[in-house]
Amino acid sequence: MSEIKLGDQWFIIVSDPQKQRGDKSSSGSYVTYQISSKPATEGDKRSGEDDITVVHRRYSDFVLLYQILANDYPACIVPPLPDKKVLNYLDRFSQSFTQKRCHSLQNFLQRLAQHPVLSQSKILHTFLVSSDWDAYQKSLAETVGNLSNKEELTETIMNAFKSVHSQSDEFVEIKEKSGKLDHNVSKIDKLFHRVVKKQEAIAEDYGKLGLSLRELQELVTTGDDRNSEVGNLGTKIKTFNEGMAQLSYSLRDLSRYIDYEYIIDLRDMEDYIDSMKQLIKLKDQKQIDYEELSDYLTRSINEKNNLISGYGSGSNFFKSKLEEFTGINQEAARREKISKLESKVQALTTEVENAKKVADAFEKEALKEVEIFEQIKTRELKRSLTTLADHHIEFYQKMVNTWSKIEESL
């Protein structure tokens, strides 16, 4: 596959989720997210702070953006959005829920900004910079309507239990790799979920130990002679307890990063892989359409040839006998059937040619999209793992510095 350059025209940060009260015409409260974006200058240099544009969008705005892009670019892998509701959270306005969604929405926009086609869309540019988004959204309401394609949905259901007869080696390999990647990312997700729970439990235990040490410190410093060895012991206990408190706080910070960002990155990657699989399924549907039309054309040609040669199927034999009893001219009826079949074959030939062109074109675009997905995936995993390593290095470096000072003072 040819090298495709990712888009690097936008730097985007989603932050500061805020609960807002709905007006009288709206239903209930909602959360807005601050989107800070700026265009990248030539030579991969960041533009100045004056070029930063700040807008506020709610989740339904993201949904509209996704729907329009999915409708306008059916051959592209449009990154998925996080689910509107998550069963784990009863309160969708809680800090934990909104902060995690905030990071996930940032991943969504960054993927769009990296896509060489989607990043050029007018709707994305308007979404990122327009201060009059509400008016723009209302103008779209009448034209957009329900963006779901009913014909495509019906086609998907009809082809759900069918498979492609001749799958290219490239797509066989793509399906195998995506399946393995999905499995591995899911395993890592579950593993780090357990890590977070374990670290939170350890941090809580360190906190309890700190309380016990504080009580012990108070006990040993209640004597009359504050300058005695017992008083010295109290000072050392206090110093040691400060180190334990620092360890507990730092461990909680590390767990918070893993829970709020790294695990979210993993789950977003799982959803992104699923979107890629959906595009491959759509490609397969185009291939199935072509194969079924080809089979139908072959059957029609065979039926026409059988009539020309004077042979027919068993059902045609009984039908011709019935027509003979009713006084229908067999030869005239045969010629009429042949004529209809010739017209049918001619129309089907055109349909098969068109279906072949559509299937080939969609396959070509799907291969490009898979390459784009691979590049974005590689970049994301590299960034995510690097940041994870940096947080662990920072944690252990802080612990080395803290306990080195404590050791000296003890």
Swiss-Prot record:
Gene3D superfamilies reported for this sequence = Arfaptin homology (AH) domain/BAR domain, Phox-like domain
One GO CC term, this protein? early endosome
Source organism's superkingdom?
A: Eukaryota
Which positions form S-S bridges? none
The topology of this chain with respect to the membrane is: Peripheral membrane protein
Localization (cell): Cytoplasm, Cytosol; Preautophagosomal structure membrane; Endosome membrane
What are this entry's molecular-function GO terms?
phosphatidylinositol-3-phosphate binding
Entry keyword annotation includes Phosphoprotein: no
The alphabetized UniProt keywords are: Autophagy, Coiled coil, Cytoplasm, Endosome, Lipid-binding, Membrane, Protein transport, Transport
Name the GO terms of the biological process aspect. cytoplasm to vacuole targeting by the Cvt pathway; early endosome to Golgi transport; endocytic recycling; glycophagy; mitophagy; piecemeal microautophagy of the nucleus; protein localization to endosome; protein transport
Pfam families named in the record:
PX
PX domain residues are 11-135
Please quote what the entry notes about the protein's domains: The PX domain binds phosphatidylinositol 3-phosphate which is necessary for peripheral membrane localization to the perivacuolar punctate structures.
Protein function: Sorting nexin, involved in the separation or division of vacuoles throughout the entire life cycle of the cells. Involved in retrieval of late-Golgi SNAREs from post-Golgi endosomes to the trans-Golgi network, for cytoplasm to vacuole transport (Cvt), and autophagy of large cargos including mitophagy, pexophagy and glycophagy.
Similarity remark: Belongs to the sorting nexin family.
Instruction: Please give the name of this protein.
Output: Sorting nexin-4
Q: Which organism is it from?
A: Eremothecium gossypii (strain ATCC 10895 / CBS 109.51 / FGSC 9923 / NRRL Y-1056)
